[in-house]
């Protein structure tokens, strides 16, 4: 079994779409092994997105991710990373396939409703950033 990390972003939580996204996650065979609702500070968002620190959108990204609560999840299944990325859809919702989370719920490229790890190493870092071992079942 493989684990991946997911975030239901502020734009989706604000519009009360978290339950719908969680339903889709479970309907697609994922086991939720960790989940919590949190309010990130700008500093916490910056630490999480540290790989983007030099990118021009970094400040805006940290502002967005800290403006209201998010749902962080650790998901498990065979091929979890690839399958979650497929279910999310392309980063740009205009390019996402119909039926994906971003195509169905995103407001824009920056407010795209969901985040997912892109590799096993990234998943390990992201899961550990938000969960300790006792919080994962």
From Swiss-Prot:
Belongs to the NDK family. Keywords: ATP-binding, Cytoplasm, Kinase, Magnesium, Metal-binding, Nucleotide metabolism, Nucleotide-binding, Phosphoprotein, Transferase. GO terms for cellular component: cytoplasm. Homotetramer. SMART domains: NDK. This is Nucleoside diphosphate kinase. InterPro entries: NDK-like_dom, NDK-like_dom_sf, Nucleoside_diP_kinase, Nucleoside_diP_kinase_AS. It is an enzyme of class 2 (transferase). Its cofactor is Mg(2+). It comes from the Bacteria. It comes from Pelobacter propionicus (strain DSM 2379 / NBRC 103807 / OttBd1). The keyword Lipid metabolism does not apply. GO terms for molecular function: ATP binding; metal ion binding; nucleoside diphosphate kinase activity. Its EC number is 2.7.4.6. It is found in: Cytoplasm. It holds the Pfam family NDK. The active site is at 115 (pros-phosphohistidine intermediate). ATP binds at residues 9, 57, 85, 91, 102, 112. The gene is ndk. PROSITE patterns: NDPK (PS00469), NDPK_LIKE (PS51374). Coiled coil: none annotated. PANTHER family: NUCLEOSIDE DIPHOSPHATE KINASE, NUCLEOSIDE DIPHOSPHATE KINASE DDB_G0292928-RELATED. Major role in the synthesis of nucleoside triphosphates other than ATP. The ATP gamma phosphate is transferred to the NDP beta phosphate via a ping-pong mechanism, using a phosphorylated active-site intermediate.
């Amino acid at each position: 079994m493989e684990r991946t990390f997911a975030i239901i972003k502020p734009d989706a939580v604000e519009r009360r779409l978290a339950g719908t996204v969680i339903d889709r996650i479970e309907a697609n065979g994922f086991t939720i092994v960790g989940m919590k609702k949190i309010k990130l500070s700008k500093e916490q968002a910056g630490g999480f997105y540290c790989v983007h620190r030099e990118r021009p959108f970094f400040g805006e990204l940290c502002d967005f991710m800290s403006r209201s609560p998010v749902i962080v999840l650790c998901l498990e299944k065979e091929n979890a990373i690839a399958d979650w990325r497929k279910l999310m859809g392309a980063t740009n919702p205009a390019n996402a396939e119909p039926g994906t989370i971003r195509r169905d719920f995103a407001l824009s490229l920056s407010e795209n409703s969901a985040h997912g790890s892109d590799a096993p190493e990234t998943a390990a870092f992201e899961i550990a950033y938000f969960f300790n071992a006792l919080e994962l079942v």
